[in-house]
A protein has these predicted regions:
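Structured catalytic-domain cores with a bias toward divalent-metal coordination
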Residues: 2-6, 13-15, 36-384
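Sec-dependent signal peptide recognition
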Residues: 19-28
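N-terminal signal peptide c-region/cleavage motif recognized by signal peptidases
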Residues: 31-33
């Protein structure tokens, strides 16, 4: 009996040994651990954004569905998520809030090729084009389907028009996951805009949010920083992307670089470089941020609005980025037969930040924006 059972005992022992060996090697090969410099580290959990699930150390691109509404307009938001191998903050970069602001969109095409999720800490969400209907429709300011400005539509509505539903998706799906947020713009298809600048709310969101937003604005590395005034008593009042974000307690900045629908590296590279600099500042990639040594800070802006519909004739001697004095002629508006209706002059001395550069003009269009600063360079307010 014993003799007859011995081969079976040996066989059972060998089977158990083989089974343990298989289990061991399966665990070694497929368990979520990394061994680095003698340390064993548990990989962190995957990052989830709507239907996307991104394992640590990987990059995934996908389309975030914008729920359909009564208008019958369907759309999506193209995103790329880098979920770094190591823990860290979540930074969201949003391009294409306005469909004809191309510099941010092209920059967000280039940035992913410069990053390796295996060498990153934290998580980066790139919104390639927030407002796809406006991009596809080649429209400025407004969505072609509902004629609404996405950057005046936050926090959005789940059952609203397509622009309101895009705002709602960004508010409900992107913002709650974000520790920091950057809304990247350029001058629209009709606007000349120079110099490139970063901007933050200097009064909204509380002291810590203001301080961290200022940190982002400086880390972006541009030579000019604009301080937005004002705060918001409710989320419904915070109709701008970054205003909604800071009112929710998320440090945020705007960036402006580019103009007139032009694709030019002189505008695109500062966005890409600035994003990398912020990633370094937040410890998400290796290296030190590259910041401006003494950036100009603009704390007050003066705006000029058109009083008439007609044709805008920009003064040929005036260029954005130049210093203008109060009373400088910026251009004239004529009717469709050439009769002069309005001479537009600078309402304050300062840097001409934005100026219409194409002929169409409507009543109450914001033709020009001036960053009000004293004429003497020695008296300009600068970051210390």
């Amino acid at each position: 009996m014993l003799i007859n059972n011995r081969p079976q005992v040996i066989l059972n022992h060998q089977f158990r040994y083989l089974s343990k060996s298989i289990v061991y090697w399966v665990c070694v090969l497929f368990s979520p651990i990394v061994v680095a410099q003698g340390d064993v580290k548990q990989l962190r959990e995957p990052f989830r954004l709507m239907q996307l699930e991104v394992p640590a150390g990987e990059r995934i691109s996908g389309k975030l569905s914008v729920n359909g509404g009564a208008d019958g307009v369907d759309t999506f938001i193209p995103v790329t998520v880098f979920h770094g191998r190591d823990s860290g903050p979540v930074l969201s970069l949003i391009a294409g809030i306005h469909g004809s602001e191309y510099s941010p969109i092209i920059s967000m095409q280039r940035l992913p090729e410069l990053l390796d999720p295996q060498a990153m800490a934290g998580t980066l969400i790139i919104v390639h084009i927030a407002n796809l209907p406006a991009f596809q429709g080649r429209s400025i300011y407004f969505g072609p389907d509902d004629l609404k400005n996405l950057n005046r539509s936050f926090p959005g509505k789940a059952d609203g028009t397509v622009t309101e539903r895009i705002a709602f998706t960004l508010t409900e799906e992107i913002m709650p996951l974000s520790d920091y947020l950057i809304d990247i713009h350029s001058g629209d298809g009709n606007e000349s805009l120079r110099p490139s600048y970063s901007a933050y709310y200097a009064e909204a969101g509380g002291a810590e949010v203001v301080d961290q937003s200022r940190r982002l604005a400086v880390a972006f590395g541009l030579e000019t920083i604009v301080q937005f005034a004002g705060s918001y008593s409710s989320l419904d009042d915070a109709i701008y992307t970054s205003a909604q974000s800071v009112t929710r307690g998320i440090p945020s900045i705007d960036v402006e670089s580019g103009e007139l629908g032009v694709i030019d590296d002189v505008f695109i590279d500062p966005i890409t470089d600035g994003a990398l600099s912020v990633l370094r500042e937040l410890g998400m990639i290796e290296g030190e941020p590259i910041v401006a040594a003494n950036p100009l800070v603009i704390s007050d802006r003066a705006r000029v609005y058109s009083e008439y519909e007609g044709i805008w004739h920009k003064d040929a001697l005036v260029k954005t980025g130049d210093f203008v004095t109060k009373g400088t002629e910026l251009g004239v508006i004529t009717d469709y037969f050439g009769k002069e209706l309005q001479t537009v002059v600078a309402p304050a001395s300062g840097v001409l930040l934005i100026l219409f550069a194409t002929p169409p003009v409507n009543v109450d269009d914001n033709i020009a924006v001036i960053g009000a600063v004293p004429p003497s360079i020695s008296s300009l307010d600068r970051v210390q």
